[in-house]
């Protein structure tokens, strides 16, 4: 029984979304490894328009279920099907992405790019 409980804790940690904070950006979501998650303003709730070369620079974030930090509602996270057949995690309906230019946990190199890419804020 204990091993099952510990496996559940490990799974929750692996699928966790956490809050990070940086001067000039404020609070934002990151994955369990601390890599920043982004929102694309050309998307709409429930629909991603980032495809092809866009996805090479902005890889999809996908976890079927995520563990969330205190003060954040798990109900605000979901998943959507994409036209390419993949699935993507959403926050309040908005698809979430990584930025290929971020190399280390806490990097926010994609913030404000093209005035359409922004860190995913709670």
Give names to the regions the model predicted.
Residues 1-8:
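Bacterial N-terminal signal peptides
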Residues 11-122:
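Compact beta-sheet-dominated domain cores in extracellular/mature segments
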């Amino acid at each position: 029984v204990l091993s099952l409980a510990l496996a559940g804790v490990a799974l929750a940690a692996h699928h966790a979304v956490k809050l990070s904070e940086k001067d000039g950006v404020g609070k934002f979501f990151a994955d369990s490894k601390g890599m920043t998650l982004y929102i694309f303003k050309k998307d709409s709730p429930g629909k991603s328009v980032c495809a092809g070369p866009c996805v090479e620079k902005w890889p999809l974030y996908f976890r079927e279920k995520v563990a969330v930090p205190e003060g954040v509602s798990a109900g605000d996270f979901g998943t959507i099907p994409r036209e390419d057949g993949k699935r993507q995690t959403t926050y309040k309906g908005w698809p979430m992405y990584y930025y290929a230019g971020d190399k280390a946990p806490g990097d926010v190199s994609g913030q404000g790019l093209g005035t359409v890419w922004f860190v995913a804020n709670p």
